């Protein structure tokens, strides 16, 4: 096996181990899931211990093709809401290499895989999905950054703007890791 492939596999395994560590997760999960942002790391660790935040299968399977995610958590928010969090570690290979369509495909696959699960009732029971992409070696202008992509409804009618219901079931979060000394205060 080529050295580059072996190195990539080792980096990938290290990233997965780090994101499965409760001490690390309890400090970063609020970045990925804003609803958990006001909860202390100690409370997050307690949620993890109590089974409110649990790792689940990373195999995303469909009839046509399967995908393997790095780390996926099932989350039960203190308010009773439930969500799924996919965390992916990503290295840039060349400028513009991060494929937003890939991030969207992972998020949509997590939505789709809920159908047929033991918790499935109907489309109203879909959990919100967060797909967090941690850029491990971002370009200099993207370091220490968090960018969110959400679905937003807009009306194209001129005369009448109907009430547009909130469609809050999918969010892609891109985090650019950087040197803390470079972060703005």
Task: Locate the predicted segments by residue.
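Elongated, amphipathic alpha-helical interaction scaffolds
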Residues: 1-185
């Amino acid at each position: 096996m080529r050295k580059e492939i072996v190195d990539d596999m080792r980096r990938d395994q290290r990233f997965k181990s780090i994101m499965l560590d409760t001490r690390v997760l309890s400090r970063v999960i609020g970045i990925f899931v804003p609803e958990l942002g006001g909860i202390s790391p100690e409370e997050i660790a307690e949620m993890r211990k109590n089974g409110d935040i649990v790792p689940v299968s990373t195999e995303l399977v469909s009839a046509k093709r399967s995908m393997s995610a790095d780390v996926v958590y099932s989350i039960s928010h203190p308010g009773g809401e439930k969500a799924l969090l996919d965390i992916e570690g990503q290295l840039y290979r060349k400028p513009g290499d991060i494929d937003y369509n890939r991030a969207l495909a992972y998020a949509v696959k997590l939505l789709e895989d809920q159908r047929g699960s033991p918790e499935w009732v109907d489309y109203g029971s879909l959990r919100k999905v967060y797909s967090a992409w941690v850029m491990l070696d971002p370009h200099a202008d993207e370091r220490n950054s968090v960018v969110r992509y959400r679905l937003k409804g807009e009306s194209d009618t001129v005369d009448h703007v109907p009430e547009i219901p909130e469609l809050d079931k999918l969010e892609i979060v891109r985090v650019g890791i950087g040197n803390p000394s470079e972060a703005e205060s």
